[in-house]
């Protein structure tokens, strides 16, 4: 009754008892409700007070300031800032109005994916704002659950290894044509590995997807669309109010650029589809688009956004991987010589099978690619993915629904997995590492439960390996500290064998 009296006084009720039992029962019910509310609030407050702390009460480190766009524009500096502040422990950063947990150690990656990985979600617009959502929101990389599975169902067939392997002879011809254009001199040629390789994967991926519909005219149209894409990404990264629908509605220049891209991209595909169907052309993209037809489960927006992600989002990424591959081969003559010898030995076999060589994981060819992608992963910081359950990550209590980001560059150099020489280019390190260590300690297209989910990985791997084969077979590579070609800033010298 003491509690009821206290609540009565708090609520301003008198102590009159003329209504007897009825008023007492009423006040009792009110008191019970208030007590339940207070208890629930206290329990919730207690739970929240434990969020982002260890069981001993240590609070997780938070990086000050808005780091949303810094993850892309100042990746190295932000990564170093996080390491200086938190060491190897997880930390929080602010991504616009959202908080994201950053992890960088194999055990933390294991904690993140353990038990609930199949139920992970992704934050709206990947926490990148309204314009990003209008641009790439429906793409497969931004989806999860049934929507993700639906898009994958339509896109996976042409990206399976068997489909890609059938394209190897055509890829080789295109790579040889490209080499002839970039290295026309009989003896010595120079390449700027950051520029000259930029559109090679892009071109061969386009060839793979459009097949009979791919020609010089369509390629130039795609290059023009890529320029628009770059402008839109710049708009997104420079937006002052990315989460404001009203601001983005009246931000005319970025809105106009986005609309121009969307209309041209849609019309480009509709024309290709019309021609492919009318002419009976082989065109994997047209087969994918059949999922958009009436009574099917793929929307045109999801189709176009996923095509945007596959083609345009990987242009600069693939160029960086090529730069890492060839600059390190040029700097390591012994690795280059060993790779050339391996290629020659494989090709001298009576039963030589090029797709089989490309698929093998125990070759130096594969190890060079793996080591290059360890050093140059797709993104320094991964896209956010949300925990389904409350869990401990790196000893901290992390609430359900927390967006988690992986510092990929630190993960790929961590001494726990890679020893003290993680910054040294050494393809043979993959000889010594058990596959279990790589599952949560290495990220190129994905890590943990995400390994192998990148749609274009088979095409990209094939193009990287085929290009290595063609270049190393025909040229000896040297580092070019000073370009011998006027007006060029070449960093690699190709000397004909």
Curated annotation (Swiss-Prot):
Its main location: membrane. GO terms for biological process: mycotoxin biosynthetic process. The chain crosses the membrane at residues 26-46. It is a single-pass membrane protein. Disruption phenotype: Does not affect the production of oxopyrrolidines A and B. GO terms for molecular function: heme binding; iron ion binding; monooxygenase activity; oxidoreductase activity, acting on paired donors, with incorporation or reduction of molecular oxygen. This is Cytochrome P450 monooxygenase opdB. The lineage of its organism: Eukaryota, Fungi, Dikarya, Ascomycota, Pezizomycotina.
């Amino acid at each position: 009754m003491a509690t009821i009296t206290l609540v009565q006084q708090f609520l301003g009720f008198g102590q009159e008892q003329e209504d007897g039992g009825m008023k007492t029962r009423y006040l009792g019910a009110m008191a019970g409700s208030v007590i339940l509310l207070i208890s629930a609030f206290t329990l919730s407050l207690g739970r929240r007070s434990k969020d982002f702390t260890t069981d001993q009460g240590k609070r997780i480190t938070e990086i000050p300031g808005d780091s949303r766009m810094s993850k892309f524009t100042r990746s190295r500096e932000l990564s170093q800032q996080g390491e200086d502040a938190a060491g190897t422990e997880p930390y929080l950063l602010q991504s616009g109005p959202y908080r994201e947990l950053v992890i960088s150690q194999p055990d933390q990656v294991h904690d993140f994916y353990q038990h609930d990985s199949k139920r992970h979600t992704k934050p709206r617009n990947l926490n990148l704002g309204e314009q990003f959502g209008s641009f790439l929101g429906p793409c497969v990389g931004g989806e999860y659950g049934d929507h993700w599975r639906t898009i994958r169902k339509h896109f996976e067939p042409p990206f399976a290894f068997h489909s890609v392997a059938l394209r190897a002879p055509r890829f080789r011809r295109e790579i040889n044509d490209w080499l002839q254009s970039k290295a026309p001199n009989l003896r010595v040629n120079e390449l700027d590995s950051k520029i000259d390789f930029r559109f090679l994967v892009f071109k061969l991926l386009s060839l793979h997807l459009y097949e009979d519909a791919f020609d010089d005219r369509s390629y130039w149209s795609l290059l023009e669309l890529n320029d628009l894409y770059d402008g839109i990404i710049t708009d997104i990264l420079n937006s002052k109010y990315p989460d404001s629908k009203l601001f983005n509605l009246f931000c005319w220049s970025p809105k106009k650029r986005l609309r121009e891209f969307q209309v041209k991209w849609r019309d480009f595909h509709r024309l290709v589809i019309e021609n492919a169907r009318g002419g009976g052309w082989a065109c994997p993209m047209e087969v994918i688009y059949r999922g958009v037809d009436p009574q099917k489960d793929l929307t045109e927006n999801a189709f176009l956004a996923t095509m945007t992600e596959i083609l345009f989002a990987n242009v600069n990424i693939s160029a960086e991987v090529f730069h890492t591959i060839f600059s390190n081969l040029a700097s390591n003559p012994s690795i280059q010589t060993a790779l050339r010898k391996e290629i020659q030995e494989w090709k001298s076999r009576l039963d030589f099978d090029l797709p089989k060589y490309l698929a093998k994981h125990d070759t130096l060819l594969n190890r060079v690619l793996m080591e290059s992608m360890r050093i140059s992963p797709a993104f320094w910081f991964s896209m956010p993915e949300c925990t389904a359950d409350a869990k401990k990550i790196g000893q901290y209590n992390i609430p359900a629904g927390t967006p988690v980001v992986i510092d990929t560059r630190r993960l790929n150099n961590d001494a726990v997995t890679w020893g003290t020489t993680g910054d040294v280019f050494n393809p043979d390190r993959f000889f010594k590492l058990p596959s279990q260590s790589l599952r949560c300690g290495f990220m190129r297209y994905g890590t943990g439960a995400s390994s192998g989910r990148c749609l274009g990985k088979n095409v990209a791997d094939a193009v990287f390996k085929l290009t290595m084969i063609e270049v190393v077979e025909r040229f000896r590579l040297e580092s070019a500290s000073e370009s011998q070609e006027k007006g060029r800033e070449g960093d690699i010298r190709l000397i004909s064998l």
